[in-house]
UniProtKB/Swiss-Prot annotation:
Name of the protein: Histidine decarboxylase
UniProt pathway: Amine and polyamine biosynthesis; histamine biosynthesis; histamine from L-histidine: step 1/1
Source organism: Bos taurus
Organismal lineage: Eukaryota, Metazoa, Chordata, Craniata, Vertebrata
An example Gene Ontology molecular-function term: pyridoxal phosphate binding
Pfam families, sorted: Pyridoxal_deC
Length: 658
């Protein structure tokens, strides 16, 4: 058994281990290489009858536990949203765990209750929340409380809204059964809302409707008003709206300035879920998303995500605490105390009875960092995300289908979903960074969140190179797996590729570049000077894409083949064969060496694009022949180019280009 002196010694040993772990976590593989049930074989069937030595227990941390850990504090952890910790936060919980009070009432631990009330007022002011969310403000009937999760906070808000509405309905229908009234209730959220909102509806037995969002993935007032009108006509009673600030998928923001007035007019409880983005409101420049917050009946966010206060720690504020207390109040004799009518008892603000002393770690973090350093932390994470966004935008093989907000960038490989899925699987094999998918508008996307306070530009560049290398491998495999077109013999072998290439040009209109919106107009036919053998053969082929091309032929600048093809195929949606235009002039056998010696060390991508070698000279082919150049199929393997590109017939003799 451990005695105080041994605890002192072992405690120092554990602090040293924690310091070593957190300062070197970037060197560890982010995700574990284990299978479900890996731990079972390493533990005895039954608990030990006699005590183990601490040395044995401590040794099993690295032997048994760490091989199965996902390292959430790693700068290379980009999945989900942050779950950060910090030295002051760890110290705070060390003390709170030693005190180990159960602060269900003021009398059970006055310091636990009163520190929480004051720290929640601090935090509300730091975020710029309305004064009606403060405990200590003249005329305020609201206040804040720490919950375990945002999921729990959303459920609590919905239960409070349900109770309040049922009491109103019983005033006019006193004989009605509460279960009958409950069956008529309906609540709303956007179709981008977190899964916990749906779960809250299931638990409370309130119908939860998920409303469509606009092009920016934001829930707007028009959609809400329409749903309310339709449901009232059906005899339903709308009671609750959950607006999300910073959705899980793409970090989109619902429009509070439109939703708020509707909720106030229609008598709906407006709850704000800002689980991740709430920390950003420490910075005044991000508070534009809070426009309309004065209409909110409740607001919740997680300091345990981005604010460096480790899990669990969720802030939850209500405008009217009495509506909350009437939902959860119980009054057994053994919980009463002399100051019950005067003091705040947080057991009436939550589902459980007992509660941890969470406010100590939050207090330690706010005091140790100060508001300015917490703001700097948020701005640093946002700048790192901007840097990653710039890297993605500069690569023509990727696209960003939704606007970046704060520290989250969503991106995907151009082409079908299977390519993006394959890239994720390839990245997961190595475990050197952790990414997860999401879907928007039937597109599979990759979420890249800057999670660590220690992330540097070098970390971002290193991870981007790993993503590029995985994409290069998947694209080359995808291309080489496609059959060569049987019409290749239509290209006369006597006409060399260099001669053919001299007649090829791909114009760009008004500097449109890679913008797909301009792609329908960039395939133009220059005046015909003479017919070559190649063009005569191509003209004999069927031309199913005649309606896709413009007849205009303005005098425009030249444009590289790769950029043109990506833009054209994106607009035309011709993605049924080879989904990639990846070309690599290095044999597959040499790609591994190139990846190791090139991309990681010097910070540049290992991809060598054959398209960059294409001559940009005038092509004298008829429109129908020209279209054959961009048919989206694979080409045969070349002696020095084991990867294949997305050109059809005219590309077959291009092997001499490499």
């Amino acid at each position: 058994m451990m005695e105080p002196e041994e605890y002192r010694e072992r405690g120092k040993e554990m602090v040293d281990y924690i310091c070593q772990y957190l300062t070197t976590v970037r060197e560890r593989r982010v995700t574990p290489d284990v299978r479900p049930g890996y731990l079972r074989a390493q533990l005895p069937e039954s608990a030990p009858m006699e005590p183990d030595s601490w040395d044995s227990i401590f040794g099993d941390i690295e032997r048994i536990i760490m091989p199965g850990v996902v390292h959430w504090q790693s700068p290379h952890m980009h999945a989900y949203y942050p779950a950060l910790t910090s030295w002051p936060s760890l110290l705070g919980d060390m003390l709170a765990d030693a005190i180990n009070c159960l602060g269900f009432t003021w009398a059970s631990s006055p310091a636990c209750t009163e520190l929480e009330m004051n720290v929640m007022d601090w935090l509300a002011k730091m975020l710029g929340l309305p004064e009606h969310f403060l405990h200590h403000h003249p005329g305020s009937q609201g206040g804040g409380v720490l919950q375990s999760t945002v999921s729990e906070s959303t459920l609590i808000a919905l239960l409070a809204a349900r109770k309040n509405k049922i009491l109103e309905m019983k005033a006019s229908e006193p004989e009605a059964d509460e279960s009958f009234l409950n069956a008529r209730l309906v609540a709303y959220a956007s179709d981008q809302a977190h899964s916990s909102v749906e779960k809250a509806g299931l638990i409370s037995l309130v119908k939860m409707k998920f409303l469509p969002v606009d092009e920016n993935f934001s829930l707007r007032g028009e959609a809400l008003q329409k749903a309310i009108k339709e449901d009232r006509e059906r005899g339903l009673v709308p009671i609750f709206v959950c607006a999300t600030l910073g959705t899980t998928g793409v970090c989109a923001f619902d429009c509070l300035s439109e939703l708020g007035p509707i909720c106030a007019r229609e008598g709906l409880w407006l709850h704000i879920d800002a689980a991740y983005a709430g920390t950003a409101f420490l910075c005044p420049e991000f508070r534009g998303f809070l426009k309309g917050i004065e209409y909110a009946d409740s607001f919740t966010f997680n300091p345990s995500k981005w604010m460096m206060v480790h899990f669990d720690c969720t802030g939850f504020w209500v405008k009217d605490k009495y509506k909350l207390q009437q939902t959860f109040s119980v009054d057994p004799v053994y919980l009463r105390h002399a100051d019950s009518g005067v003091a705040t008892d947080f057991m009436h603000w939550q589902i459980p009875l007992s509660r941890r002393f969470r406010s100590i770690k939050l207090w330690f973090v706010i005091r140790s960092f100060g508001v300015k350093n917490l703001q700097a932390h948020v701005r640093h994470g946002t700048e790192m995300a901007k840097y990653f966004e710039s890297l993605v935008r500069n690569d023509p093989f990727f696209e960003i289908p939704a606007k970046r907000h704060l520290g989250l960038v969503v991106f995907r490989l151009k082409g079908p979903n299977c390519l993006t899925e394959s890239v994720l699987k390839e990245i997961a094999k190595a475990g050197r960074l952790f990414l997860i998918p999401a879907t928007i508008q039937d597109k599979l996307i990759i979420r890249f969140t800057v999670t660590s306070q220690f992330t540097t530009r070098d970390d971002i560049l290193r991870d981007w190179n790993l993503i590029q290398d995985a994409a290069t491998l998947i694209l080359s495999q995808h291309c080489t797996s496609q059959p060569s077109p049987q019409g290749a013999n239509l290209i006369l072998q006597t006409r060399g590729p260099r001669a053919l290439a001299k007649e090829m040009s791909f114009p760009s209109v008004n500097g449109a570049g890679d913008d797909p919106a301009h792609s329908r107009k960039i395939v133009m036919q220059p005046p015909r000077v003479g017919a070559s053998p190649v063009s005569r053969h191509l003209e004999t082929l069927l031309d199913p894409l005649d309606d896709c091309f413009s007849e205009e032929a303005p005098d425009v600048t030249e444009h590289k083949l790769s950029s043109f093809l990506f833009s054209y195929l994106s607009v035309q949606n011709k993605r049924k064969a080879v989904r990639s235009l990846s070309c690599n002039s290095v044999p597959v056998s040499a790609q591994k060496q190139l990846t190791t010696e090139g991309s990681v060390k010097n910070g540049s991508s290992s991809r060598v694009r054959i398209f960059s070698r294409f001559p940009e000279e005038v092509m004298m082919l008829k429109k129908s022949a020209f279209k054959k150049l961009i048919k989206f199929y694979s080409v045969p393997n070349f002696p020095e180019c084991s990867s294949q590109c997305g050109l059809q017939l005219p590309c077959c003799p291009l092997q001499a280009m490499v």
